[in-house]
From Swiss-Prot:
Belongs to the universal ribosomal protein uS2 family. HAMAP family: Ribosomal_uS2_B. GO terms for molecular function: structural constituent of ribosome. Keywords: Ribonucleoprotein, Ribosomal protein. One of its GO terms (cellular component) is cytosolic small ribosomal subunit. This is Small ribosomal subunit protein uS2. It comes from Latilactobacillus sakei subsp. sakei (strain 23K) (Lactobacillus sakei subsp. sakei). GO terms for biological process: translation. The gene is rpsB.
Length: 264
């Protein structure tokens, strides 16, 4: 059985691509049709490719791989943080700092500083310092926490990176490529799939679509590490059953193509 049904994908709006004037021709093979000026992603292919991504992630997790979830756009921030933590992994959900991977030694120094400030707060040092100095330290802590909190405990450069919106996260992807880190990504109709190792054709703007796919990648990590019985899957309204054909899905899109297309 597929790890996600077409019905689940449909109800989360995974099939909605971008407007036809905003597309990357390399995504043509993943597009089923066009309706009302919007490309419709072929969910039959997405079902298969989610399965492939799930198996890849599960195998890497079984081999004790370290995973970094990356998604800095507003629609992805919560899902990226929550699902990576649920899987016991790491995340970047605000601005990607250049060199996060390729200059890991420098990033580790910033992380060390973050931990030092936290320790000062916890051991009572702040109580003995002037208020002005404490305010500056807290401001520094807040900034470091925002950008590095999700990788504070990451033991090494990740073995796999999961990305929402490769166009927005192109710097992160370039760093991963330079270090031969495989990238699993949700790829919308305006992105270049050639940059991605494991492609999931998907709407990467709708919150529900992002949550659905991201949660499933977290499930794969948990299953790979602990076994299928320990996977606590996220709950979605969609029933886990085989979906309708792509033709029926396209019919459903008629008159409803403004749903789940945030920021398209």
């Amino acid at each position: 059985m597929a790890v996600l049904s077409m019905k689940q994908l449909l109800e989360a709006g995974v099939h909605f691509g971008h407007q036809t004037r905003r597309w990357n021709p390399k995504m043509k093979k993943f597009i089923f049709t066009e309706r009302n000026g919007i490309y419709i992603i072929d969910l039959q292919k997405t079902v298969r490719m989610v399965d492939d991504a799930y198996d890849f992630v599960k195998e890497e997790a079984a081999n004790e791989g370290v995973f970094l979830f990356v998604g800095t756009k507003k629609q992805a921030q919560d899902a990226i943080a929550e699902e990576s933590v649920r899987a016991g992994q790491y995340f970047v959900n605000h601005r990607w700092l250049g060199g996060t991977l390729t200059n890991w030694d420098t990033i580790q120094k910033r992380i060390k500083r973050l931990k030092e400030i936290k320790a000062m707060d916890e051991d009572g040092t702040f109580e003995r310092l002037p208020k002005k100095e404490v305010a500056l330290l807290k401001k520094q802590q807040e900034k470091l926490e925002k950008f590095l909190g999700g990788i504070e405990d990451m033991p090494r450069i990740p073995d796999v990176m999961f990305v929402v919106d490769p166009r927005k996260e192109r710097i992160a992807i370039k760093e991963a490529q330079k270090l031969n880190i495989p990238v699993v990504a949700m790829v919308d109709t305006n992105s270049d799939p050639d940059d991605i190792d494991v492609i999931i054709p998907s709407n990467d703007d709708a919150i529900r679509a992002v949550r659905l796919i991201t949660a499933k990648m977290a499930d794969a990590i948990i299953e790979g590490r602990q076994g299928e019985d320990d996977v606590e899957e996220a709950t979605f309204a969609a029933e886990n059953k085989s979906a309708d054909s792509m033709e029926e899905i396209v019919e459903a899109v008629e008159g409803n193509n403004d749903t789940n297309t945030d920021a398209k």
